[in-house]
């Protein structure tokens, strides 16, 4: 293989590389075997056409595209490695020449990782809007949340108030015509929860079981169903039940209901304080780490960050989000219909975060390189064991899923983060 690289602009260039016949011939054989079973020729059973007959009838050139797809990935990666390039986006491949019996020549337009000029990243002084302190109010608030979770809904003989739950039937109409999704039976609605469009819940305050209430509202201009956006609607609503929350007393019995390992309310407060202090400590450390990394990135200069890196990071985030939606049974088409958004609308919110994430990774990688951080065999094994424990899977399975290079990279990145944060101080 012969390779060359022509620089076209900052972080951009063209690789030219060749693929030898000793690589091409096996690829042509695989391409032929792939289609052989479907071939017919006089005097031969289907799927048994000899290669010379095929070449004479169709020409070997018809196999070139499939053969190229077979041999290209390995050839391209070999060229990138030989040239010592750090490519960061999908290349644009073009065929320069593909002649029978000769080596093939291809070109690849590539984007390379930008230069990072590091600034100060050690002994940084940062400000954080966080505290390690846990107050009595924090402990009481946690207990109160648990107390509210144990509340029971009981039938209320009287008017519905904010915070009460009403069980309703409703039928919605616009200009006297009922509309899709405007009907519900035995729906439990907590007044003040904001589940329904603005104004709906407020008009049920004061209603009693057995009442029929005409609720008049206007759909927001931004409502996802365009045929309803901005329109006035009427909902004929029947109140079946009014329920109110009955919250348990704040006493030792409540404490035991919340946590069976404690005997008194005071025991629960002590336990919750320890838990909150541990969580607050972690939150504080995370805030310091985030602020220190952010300052290290701000102190660095990234020379002509390629927009392709941002686009690829956005695509990764969008694909991850849509994958989560599909696992919940929501297809991309359904999601866009339900939300009234487009593919472009989905990409936009991720752009700023993607830009920040790409810059952060580049700077941390540059610090790891500047410090000469590498992963030892024992560190790699420890990382594998830690991941196996975290994801509850055998270590061998983790080892098979992650390449050694990926693990080495992650460990070096962690060391770089450690050198930033361990030397940082809080103003």
Curated annotation (Swiss-Prot):
GO terms assigned for molecular function: peptidyl-prolyl cis-trans isomerase activity; protein folding chaperone; ribosome binding
Signal peptide start and end residues: none
Keyword Metal-binding: no
Any GO CC annotation of this UniProt entry: cytoplasm
Main location: cytoplasm
Catalytic activity field: [protein]-peptidylproline (omega=180) = [protein]-peptidylproline (omega=0)
Pfam family, one: Trigger_C
GO BP field: 'de novo' cotranslational protein folding; cell division; chaperone-mediated protein folding; protein transport; protein unfolding
SUPFAM superfamilies on file: FKBP-like, Triger factor/SurA peptide-binding domain-like, Trigger factor ribosome-binding domain
Family affiliation: Belongs to the FKBP-type PPIase family. Tig subfamily.
UniProt domain comment: Consists of 3 domains; the N-terminus binds the ribosome, the middle domain has PPIase activity, while the C-terminus has intrinsic chaperone activity on its own.
Protein's name in the database: Trigger factor
Organism listed in the record: Streptococcus pyogenes serotype M49 (strain NZ131)
């Amino acid at each position: 293989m012969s390779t060359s690289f022509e620089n076209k602009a900052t972080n951009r260039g063209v690789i030219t590389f060749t693929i030898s016949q000793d690589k091409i011939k096996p690829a042509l054989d695989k391409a032929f075997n792939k289609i052989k079973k479907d071939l017919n020729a006089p005097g031969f059973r289907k799927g048994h056409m000899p290669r010379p007959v095929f070449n004479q009838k169709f020409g070997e050139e018809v196999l070139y595209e499939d053969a190229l797809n077979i041999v290209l990935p390995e050839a391209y990666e070999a060229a990138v490695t030989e040239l010592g390039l750090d490519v960061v986006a999908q290349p644009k491949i073009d065929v320069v020449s593909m002649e029978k019996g000769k080596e093939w020549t291809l070109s690849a337009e590539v984007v390379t990782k930008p230069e990072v000029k590091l600034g100060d990243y050690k002994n940084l002084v940062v400000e954080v809007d966080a505290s390690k302190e846990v107050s009595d109010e924090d402990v009481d608030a946690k207990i109160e949340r648990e107390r509210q979770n144990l509340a029971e809904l009981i039938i209320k003989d009287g008017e519905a108030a904010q915070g009460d739950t009403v069980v309703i039937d409703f039928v919605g109409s616009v200009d006297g015509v009922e509309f899709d999704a405007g009907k519900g039976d035995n729906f439990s609605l907590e007044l003040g929860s904001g589940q329904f469009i603005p104004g709906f819940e407020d008009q049920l305050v004061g209603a009693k079981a057995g009442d029929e209430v005409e609720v008049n509202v206007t759909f927001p201009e931004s409502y996802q169903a365009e045929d309803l956006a901005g329109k006035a609607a009427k909902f004929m609503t029947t109140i079946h039940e009014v329920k109110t929350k009955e919250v348990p007393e704040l006493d030792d019995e409540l404490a035991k209901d919340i946590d069976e390992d404690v005997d008194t309310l005071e025991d629960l407060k002590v336990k919750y304080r320890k838990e909150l202090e541990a969580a607050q400590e972690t939150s504080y450390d995370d805030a310091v780490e985030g602020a220190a990394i952010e300052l290290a990135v701000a102190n660095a200069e990234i020379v002509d960050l390629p927009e392709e890196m941002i686009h690829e990071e956005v695509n990764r985030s969008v694909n991850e989000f849509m994958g989560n939606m599909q696992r919940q049974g929501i297809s991309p088409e359904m999601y866009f219909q339900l939300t009234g958004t487009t593919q472009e609308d989905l990409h936009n919110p991720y752009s700023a975060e993607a830009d920040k994430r790409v810059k952060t990774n580049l700077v941390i990688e540059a610090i790891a390189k500047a410090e000469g951080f590498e992963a030892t065999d024992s560190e790699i094994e420890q990382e594998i064991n830690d991941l196996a424990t975290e994801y509850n899977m055998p270590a061998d399975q983790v080892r098979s899923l992650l390449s050694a290079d990926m693990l080495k990279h992650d460990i070096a990145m962690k060391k770089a983060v450690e050198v930033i944060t361990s030397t940082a101080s809080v103003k």
